[in-house]
Amino acid sequence: MLCFERRLPSDTPADLEMAFTFEQRERSRLRFPLPDGREAAFLIERGAPLVEGERLGTAEGLVLAIQAKPELLMEVRTSDPLTLVRAAYHLGNRHVRLEIGAHWLRLPPDYVLRDMLMRLGVEVFEVTAPYQPESGAYGGGHHHSHSHHEGDEFHSKPRLHHFGGSQ
């Protein structure tokens, strides 16, 4: 299995490109099939989701370009900026991860949130688009190890999450 373990500069020429959903890009360990059928995984530090255009490398020198896979989302719009800010406030109060544009908010589909948003006076549309929510005010990550031994990164053996095929 090929292990993509190193983050590389985004201008590093890529040998292949693959698209992942935000949920997949948020994981620090993920097993996946390459287009040619070989098994691969990324094994990266926790706390920093992969973003569109990022590059990962293997010890063998193979470089993977990360793409954000389009996914079904709710897009919140209104012509009134204050109403949009109110909607963002109420979603934030519920710890909903948001992608914020100049005139819209995007979030994963949720019928309860859709009803709340409609009551606030915004329009809610279904869109299919790449999803890259805000990372949060504090940088979004729990970066230290709980190990008491220098060099031990994991308390227990890391688990790989699977997608696209048999486990």
From Swiss-Prot:
Q: Which GO terms describe its molecular function?
A: nickel cation binding; unfolded protein binding
Q: Keywords assigned by UniProt?
A: Chaperone, Cytoplasm, Nickel, Nickel insertion
Q: Which Gene3D superfamilies match?
A: Urease metallochaperone UreE, N-terminal domain, UreE, C-terminal domain
Entry's SUPFAM superfamilies?
A: Urease metallochaperone UreE, C-terminal domain, Urease metallochaperone UreE, N-terminal domain
Q: Report biased composition (Basic residues) as residue ranges.
A: 157-167
Name where it's found: Cytoplasm
**Glycosyltransferase is among the record's keywords:** no
Tell me, what does this protein do in biology?
Involved in urease metallocenter assembly. Binds nickel. Probably functions as a nickel donor during metallocenter assembly.
Official protein name in the record:
Urease accessory protein UreE
Origin organism is Nitrosococcus oceani (strain ATCC 19707 / BCRC 17464 / JCM 30415 / NCIMB 11848 / C-107)
Q: What is the lineage of its organism?
A: Bacteria, Pseudomonadati, Pseudomonadota, Gammaproteobacteria, Chromatiales
